[in-house]
């Protein structure tokens, strides 16, 4: 049986510990791993996971380019194992450019995180982002954190109805 992990955050080694700790702190949970690609490979081997959707989240628009370069490079180094999902930032002035670059780079989809990126999943910026993506690639969107107002089920439902 093929096992695919559809939600894996990865980071460059130099920031992996800090980034993983930030997520652990945000959710008040212990991280399952340290965010490094080498550790992910080891964990996949032990668990029998054959493929992963890998991504990271730009918490501000200036991070998009470097994150997507890292994700693309990592996916290219592991072409049958990792499928890279681009980050875009819906509040960015150059959102269309970000999306077009990700598509042209051959990334496999998009990852959005309303709570970290501070946009409403049913707001104007999200709707505009989905209009530009126009169904060309799948979108993985964080949902349901009841501590923040951005990604509740009712907001995701509105987004899904607008873009079935």
Task: List each model region and its residues.
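A generic "structured core" feature
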Residues: 2-11, 45, 98, 102-103, ...
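N-terminal cationic-hydrophobic initiation segments that often serve targeting/anchoring roles
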Residues: 44, 75-79, 160-161
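Hydrophobic packing residues within well-ordered alpha-helices of enzyme cores
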Residues: 71, 156-159
């Amino acid at each position: 049986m093929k096992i695919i992990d559809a939600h894996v955050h990865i980071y460059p080694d130099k920031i992996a510990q800090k980034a993983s700790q930030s997520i652990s702190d945000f959710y008040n949970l212990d991280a399952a791993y340290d965010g490094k690609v080498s550790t992910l490979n080891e964990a996949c081997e032990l668990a029998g996971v054959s493929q992963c959707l890998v991504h990271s989240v730009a918490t501000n628009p200036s991070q998009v380019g470097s994150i997507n370069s890292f994700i693309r490079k990592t996916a290219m180094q592991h072409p049958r194992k990792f499928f890279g999902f681009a980050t875009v930032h819906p509040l960015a002035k150059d959102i269309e450019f970000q999306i077009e670059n990700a598509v042209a780079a051959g990334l496999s989809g998009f990852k959005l995180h309303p709570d970290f990126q501070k946009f409403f999943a049913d707001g104007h910026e999200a709707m505009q982002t989905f209009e530009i993506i126009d169904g060309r690639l799948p979108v993985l969107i964080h949902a349901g954190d009841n501590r923040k107002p951005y990604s509740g089920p009712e907001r995701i439902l509105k987004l899904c109805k607008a873009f079935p």
